[in-house]
Amino acid sequence: MKIGVIGSGSFGTALGSLLADKGYEVTLWCRNDSQIESINRNHINNKHLPDFTLPEKLTASKDLRTVVQGKDMIVSSPPSHALTEILREIKEYLPEKVPIVSASKGIENGTLRLVSEIFESELPGKYHSYLSYLSGPSFAKEIIQKVPTIVSIASRSETTARKVQEIFSFLYFRTYWTPDVIGVEVGGSLKNVIALAAGVSDGLGFGQNTRAALITRGLNEITKIGLKLGADPMTFLGPSGMGDLILTCCGEQSRNRTVGFRLGKGETLEQILSGMNEVAEGIKTTQSAYELSQKLGIEMAITNEVYKMLYEDKNPKEVVKDLMKRDLKREGVLV
């Protein structure tokens, strides 16, 4: 089986490494010449995962057509803001009747489209039943280290979901399939916004009580917007919901939590981003999530405060203070 992976960041590389470990022939799309040479000659992604040796069956190419054309499965893992442009480029030579697996997370700025909506808008209908979406608590480094990991595979087609589930499942990587595409996407996108808030809390020196509060109320916000969009609420208790939320809010490898932590310590967003090698999706997603909540008429207090901190220069200390001063409410999933 030949597999093309679009995106040579840490997560795309980790998924490619997993599939190559299973014996599949994997080609990774990469824009950087030195990175391509390092992967092909030394089996190391020198830009994103310099401390790990990659399988010999994983190679890299700068030619997107070479990566995609004639493959038996496509894995798409670019930053969500780059997805539309990439799909418009590849749809002329994208193979038909093969699984297309998206691992991108986010809500497109301006259009407010989920990743599935981008795929279904940009690709002809003949591809739609072959689309699936992978999400769950899975740091790239730990996948490459073969740490036991679980994720969700969502697809509107059970046949596609089960096929992708079988291809990805391995000794250290277990997958659960679900038809709830919207729920998996909403959980995977909005957890990054909540992780920014959790990082701010840690950076300000608050304790685990505060982090637990943010995770709990963050899940409430994710569930509210998910239900409004038609998701199954049970999805948010699974790997792509609570599982990913806990990992991203608590794990030291979390880019979004790290950005929040540094903001809490007093750095500016510009200072933080200037030294980052990977994309923190939560920054762009916060803007889209805020606009989507306004459009749908849903109160999302944590998201609103993170938005004010990122885009209106609100002091992180004031963010936490204002969250604690909100009107008292009855406990419940949707309040």
From Swiss-Prot:
Pathway: Membrane lipid metabolism; glycerophospholipid metabolism. The active site is at K191. The keyword NAD applies. One of its GO terms (biological process) is glycerol-3-phosphate catabolic process. Transmembrane segments: none annotated. It catalyses: sn-glycerol 3-phosphate + NAD(+) = dihydroxyacetone phosphate + NADH + H(+); sn-glycerol 3-phosphate + NADP(+) = dihydroxyacetone phosphate + NADPH + H(+). Catalyzes the reduction of the glycolytic intermediate dihydroxyacetone phosphate (DHAP) to sn-glycerol 3-phosphate (G3P), the key precursor for phospholipid synthesis. HAMAP family: NAD_Glyc3P_dehydrog. This is Glycerol-3-phosphate dehydrogenase [NAD(P)+]. It comes from Leptospira borgpetersenii serovar Hardjo-bovis (strain JB197).
